[in-house]
From Swiss-Prot:
The keyword Nucleus applies. Keywords: Activator, DNA-binding, Nucleus, Transcription, Transcription regulation. This is Nuclear transcription factor Y subunit B-3. CDD domains: HFD_NFYB. Residues 1-39, 145-164 are annotated as: Disordered. It comes from the Eukaryota. GO terms for molecular function: DNA-binding transcription activator activity, RNA polymerase II-specific; DNA-binding transcription factor activity, RNA polymerase II-specific; protein heterodimerization activity; sequence-specific DNA binding. Pfam families: CBFD_NFYB_HMF. Residues 70-81 are annotated as: Subunit association domain (SAD). The keyword Nucleus applies. GO terms for cellular component: CCAAT-binding factor complex. It comes from Oryza sativa subsp. japonica (Rice). Ubiquitous.
Amino acid sequence: MADGPGSPGGGGGSHESGSPRGGGGGGGGGGGGGGVREQDRFLPIANISRIMKKAIPANGKIAKDAKETVQECVSEFISFITSEASDKCQREKRKTINGDDLLWAMATLGFEDYIEPLKVYLQKYREMEGDSKLTAKAGDGSVKKDVLGSHGGSSSSAQGMGQQAAYNQGMGYMQPQYHNGDVSN
């Protein structure tokens, strides 16, 4: 293991030793050294690859080392932001980190440009989460059926689709547009 349990993000240890990076199979992975298993530290490489492919032209290719580098950067970024948010929660004597804590940490650490789109996302998420909690309390989903019947096809799920569309529009900066080989956001 390259990292000790108390070293968020790796502390400079190299992962070029041929170890699997979310490649599936390879059960276990932890040798009992007390560190975090690599598959627990990193997001799956397939997910990283899928996200990266959305940002390049359809015929573009991404080298394996580029995917692995982004995979490690994402892990480091998550640790960096979460650590700052955790420190804030400890100072405020709270045990749970919430979305607002993460946004505060991002602003504190210099990622101000991402705050507004993430606030939009967080608001939409909370609205949708609230709707799903109400539906879950109804048991078998009869609330949706009642709404469908009394409003002629206008249901809370249709509202959810509208919210998802608003979310997709708000986060459109993440999917660059390509015109004649040029990238524009």
